[in-house]
Amino acid sequence: MEIILAEPRGFCAGVKRAVDILAITLEKYKNERQVYVLHEIVHNKYIVEDFKKQGVVFVSSIKEIEDNGGILIFSAHGVSKNIEDEAKRKGIQVIDATCPLVNKVHKEAKRYENSGKELILIGHENHPEVKGIRGRVNNPITLVQTLQDVYDLKVKDPDNLSYVTQTTLSIDDTRDIIAALKLRFPGITGPDLKDICYATQNRQNAVKKLAEIVDMVLVVGSKNSSNSNRLLDLCTARGKRAYLIDNYRCVNKSWFQGVEKIGITAGASAPDILVDELMDYLKVSMNVEVSVMPGGIIENVQFKIPNLV
């Protein structure tokens, strides 16, 4: 049996930055102040549970933190302006681990609003990134999730529209939605696909190629990870069996019956250790040969850690 690894896979620069910020902050203050994270630092069960064991407290609301208490880290997904303001009012020291590419979308949304545009957001309801983007502007943003949403869309002025997008969407689906928006509202302005982050694009392009040359794909990532779910969707859309797994313990050996080539990829919030453990498990469980998919992109993007850390 042959295992082919997607390239690239796993951590993106924004996730690595957020995880590093939390690790450095914890090391610096663990004996002095409680470290909190609003929501999950990234959408990966292993990462969150590991930091919990080290003493990090994950909260769903700033109300759970006492005034002037501890250090609060905003997750990679970003937060609304109201949450920032609430933390200031409570005297909580904040370290912002928002991905710089998400911050870019925040600035775009604000710029469009300041120019008087009615805003449309392409994204997934209730995703923390979407909540953060919506909370960066004063006026309501209309959320579009599907092509049907575009057809049903009602706007104030069809000649005065702009859109932004969540960074972790399906490139193919987003391209179709943008095309539908431009067809229905020819005057609409927006960033094309540029707001879909480089890592999301690279991992989706890689898994498309991977799905063409294997019989089955294992996607390492958590169920609440948007980008991991998109990788799964791309495989199944191409008629390939695919499974989203947190770790090697989720593997069912019956999946491999009749399979000669297994593809493995990992979402942008899945650490290398989970892929390594999966590989070790498969090597012990069955006779496998391992290779890396040819022609993959080697990423070298790095984001700066804030000076406050």
Curated annotation (Swiss-Prot):
At the top level, the lineage of the source is Bacteria
For this UniProt record, the keywords arranged alphabetically read as follows: 4Fe-4S, Iron, Iron-sulfur, Isoprene biosynthesis, Metal-binding, Oxidoreductase
Q: Where does dimethylallyl diphosphate bind?
A: 43, 77, 127, 225-227, 269
Q: Which cofactor does it need?
A: [4Fe-4S] cluster
- GO MF: 4 iron, 4 sulfur cluster binding; 4-hydroxy-3-methylbut-2-enyl diphosphate reductase activity; metal ion binding
Keyword Ribosomal protein in the entry? The reply is: no
- UniProt keyword Oxidoreductase present: yes
Entry-linked CDD domains: lytB_ispH
Q: Return the broad EC class.
A: oxidoreductase
Enzymatic reactions: isopentenyl diphosphate + 2 oxidized [2Fe-2S]-[ferredoxin] + H2O = (2E)-4-hydroxy-3-methylbut-2-enyl diphosphate + 2 reduced [2Fe-2S]-[ferredoxin] + 2 H(+); dimethylallyl diphosphate + 2 oxidized [2Fe-2S]-[ferredoxin] + H2O = (2E)-4-hydroxy-3-methylbut-2-enyl diphosphate + 2 reduced [2Fe-2S]-[ferredoxin] + 2 H(+)
Among the Pfam families in the record, one is LYTB
UniProt pathway annotation: Isoprenoid biosynthesis; dimethylallyl diphosphate biosynthesis; dimethylallyl diphosphate from (2E)-4-hydroxy-3-methylbutenyl diphosphate: step 1/1; Isoprenoid biosynthesis; isopentenyl diphosphate biosynthesis via DXP pathway; isopentenyl diphosphate from 1-deoxy-D-xylulose 5-phosphate: step 6/6
Q: Where is the active site?
A: 129
Residues involved in isopentenyl diphosphate binding: 43, 77, 127, 225-227, 269
Supply the EC number(s): 1.17.7.4
Q: Which residues bind (2E)-4-hydroxy-3-methylbut-2-enyl diphosphate?
A: 43, 77, 127, 167, 225-227, 269
**Note accompanying the cofactor annotation:** Binds 1 [4Fe-4S] cluster per subunit.
Q: Where does [4Fe-4S] cluster bind?
A: 12, 99, 197
Similarity remark: Belongs to the IspH family.
PANTHER family for this protein: 4-HYDROXY-3-METHYLBUT-2-ENYL DIPHOSPHATE REDUCTASE
Q: What does this protein do?
A: Catalyzes the conversion of 1-hydroxy-2-methyl-2-(E)-butenyl 4-diphosphate (HMBPP) into a mixture of isopentenyl diphosphate (IPP) and dimethylallyl diphosphate (DMAPP). Acts in the terminal step of the DOXP/MEP pathway for isoprenoid precursor biosynthesis.
Q: What name appears for this protein in its UniProt entry? A: 4-hydroxy-3-methylbut-2-enyl diphosphate reductase
Identify the species of origin.
Answer: Wolbachia sp. subsp. Drosophila simulans (strain wRi)
Q: Which gene encodes it?
A: ispH
